[in-house]
Structures are given as structure tokens and as C-alpha cells.
Amino acid sequence: MKLNKFKIIFFIIVLVILIVLVGILGFKWSKHHEVETRVLKNQSDNTNYIEKRDKSVKAPKKLKTVVDKKEPMYGQIDKYLKETHFNGTVAVFDNGKLKMNKGYGYKDIEKGKKNTANTMFLIGSSQKFTTGLMLKQLELEHKLYLNEPVKKYLQWFKTDKEITIKDLMLHKSGLYKYEASTNIKNLDQAVLSIQKRGIDDEIYHKHSYNDANYLVLAKVIEKVTGKPYVQNYYNRLGNKFHLKHSAFYDEKPLQNEMAKGYKFKNNSFSFLRPNVLDQYFGAGNLYMAPYDMGKLIHILQQDKIFSSNVTNPMLHEFGTEEYPEEYRYGFYVTPYLNRVNGVFFGQTFTAYFNDRYIAILGTNIKNTNGFVPNEDKMKHIFYNILNQKKPYNTPGVKVHDKHHINQ
């Protein structure tokens, strides 16, 4: 009799445990299913925000073509770009003053529309620079912490090995390379696909450049602020610093200034249709005039985004405990200059800068064999014409203020 009672009690306990486990697993599955159901909706918060914004935004006042005739170097840049058949727009600032802003060739070859100072280029990975600035803002506001795991902010973003916010920022997450698809319709769907693919053990905690990292960061920014990425961009950078010649790919008021990207093959130009931009918030769907990028960089240099004790190490240190590598927050700090760069759908957008000069080239023709690549044009302009050959940043040296730079 006692044995039967024991069996009954044991059976009841096991049954209760099973019911609890099933309940827990069911809850977790329902939460994950809820995430999947939500992200599978094609309409996103970013799209909704842009549609509302379109109703109140007007095209900005036109920028004028500028070539400073008082200093011969700008005429030399103009001559060089013509000789190398440059198709795009150049902007150069000297100590924050605009010295050159001029378009060359065509932004829309089929319709014969020329590039001007106002042309906005698809900046590709240069957008990671703006994502990085917003990430740093949230870090300083104590809304996120670099050394904490991503799953603290995106509870459903589970991986076999722990990934921190810093891993994403430095491209050391080990996540598989992002594979864009026309079946993916928004940022949420992109990040879910990244989570499902998981980690490549061979590159875990090794630098491996990957759009996936900044797409996930964009989602983290949305999560901790409770606002769409686009709204964060405008609140924190675009509207705040009057970047009027920049816009996301689907903003209607500035469509007329957005360049079309091309490749040149068999003596003809082919349009490269950017058909996956709806999933690239944070990592490649922003259009920008070179003027606006120069303006943003100068604003950063003037400590108008962060205090000097944050800005100076960010812009000058590498090989230190805080900044062990050249790459951080979407841009590079190197011995001779700082660099922002992006390449996407035939368009290349590159900025070189130091404490005196900021030079930006945006082009909408893919690098072609037999022509001077965009990066080589940048090097010639910065090193040879502007004569910026002196070391700028010193490895392993901590920087507190501008007085310590190169000392």
C-alpha cells in the first residue's frame, strides 16, 4: 500500500514538473514566435516615420558651386578631377571653411542630369559613422554599455557564444557575413536573419568587416530609445546639426538630388538598381551630399557632439587600451589621416580628414579597370595637392586634449 502511495506521489511530482517545463518552453516559443510574427510584417516603424516626415519636409536651399580662386591648390584639384574623368562631387574644407564644392559628370545619365554641389550619393558603409556617433551618445547617456551582451537589449538575439555591443562596434562579433535578399523587407527581418545564421567560429573575436554588426547595432539603438532608427538619426544628428542635404533612400522631398549608381562595361553605362535598401538602416541606406559629411565631421571636431575629453581620444588614439585598433564607431584613425568610406551599388563615398582639412569625394560610377580608382584620387588630392604628408596620429599615445596630439 505504501509503495503504491509513493508511486502516486512520484507520478504527480513528475507530472507537475513536466507541466511546468512545457509551460516555460511554450512561453519562450510564444515570445520568439511573437518576435518572428512582428518582424515578418513588411511595413516598418522607419517607413511609417518617413511617410509622416515627408508631409512636412521641403527641399533645402540649393548649395552653390565653390572653387576658391585665391589659393591655387583648388584649381589644381579641379584640373586633376577633369583629367581623370571624375564623375561625382568633391567638397573640401580648410579649418571648417568651405573652399571647394563642385560636381562633375552626371547623376542620371539616362536623363542627362548633371552632378552638382547638391548631388546626394548613396554613402553605403559611411553610414556606419553616423550609427557610431549615435551609439557613443547612448553610451554616454548610460542607456547602453559596450561590454554588456547584445541579448541584454535584444532578449531574443541568442547565439552560441556571447556577443557584446563592443564586439559589434569593432566588427569582432564573429557573425556570418550579412546576405541581403529581396525577400527581406525591413531592419527587423534583417536582424532576425542574422541571428538565425549565428556565429562563424573561425572569425569570432577577430576583426572581420560585416554589415551585420551595424544592422544589429541599429536595432539595439531602436530598442534602448523606443524610437525608429530614422527618428534617432534626425533627433540626434540630422535636424540637430542642420544636415539638410542628407536623406534616407525613400524620402520623397529629396529624390531629385539622389544620384543613380552605374558600372561601365563594354563602352556603356549600366544602372545598378539599389533593391535592398529597405533592410539597411544603420549600415547603408543614407544618401548624403559631400558638403553635409564635411559639415558633420567639422561639428564633431569642434566638440559640438561630445566633450573634448571624449572627442580627442576618439579622433586620435589607436593602439591604446581604450582604442586598440584603427577602426572604431564606423570610421578609421590612421597615422596620417582619419577615414570614412562606403561602397554600395556603384557609388563610392570617401572622406579623409585631419585637424586642418576635410576632403570628400562622392562618385556614382563603379571603379573601372583603366580608370583611376576613387581611393587613389583621394590620396592624390590629400597627400600631393593639399600636401598633408606629416604624421597626424601616434600609435600607443593617450590623447586628452589637442595639445597632446603628436607630442
Regions found by a protein language model. Give the residues of each.
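Active-site helix/loop module of the DD-peptidase/beta-lactamase fold
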Residues: 122-125, 138-175, 224-261
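Short active-site loop at a secondary-structure junction
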Residues: 84-89, 111-167, 201-209, 281-284, ...
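Amphipathic coiled-coil signal-relay and dimerization helices
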Residues: 98-104
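Catalytic-site signature segments of enzymes, centered on catalytic residues
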Residues: 179-251, 280-284
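Alpha-helical scaffold elements that line and support the substrate/ligand-binding pocket
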Residues: 90-92, 96, 122-143, 168, ...
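Catalytic loop of the DD-peptidase/beta-lactamase superfamily, centered on the K-T-G motif
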Residues: 2-94, 98, 276-407
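A generic structural motif
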Residues: 105-107, 364-365
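The feature captures the short pre-catalytic strand/loop hairpin that immediately precedes
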Residues: 110, 189-200, 265-278
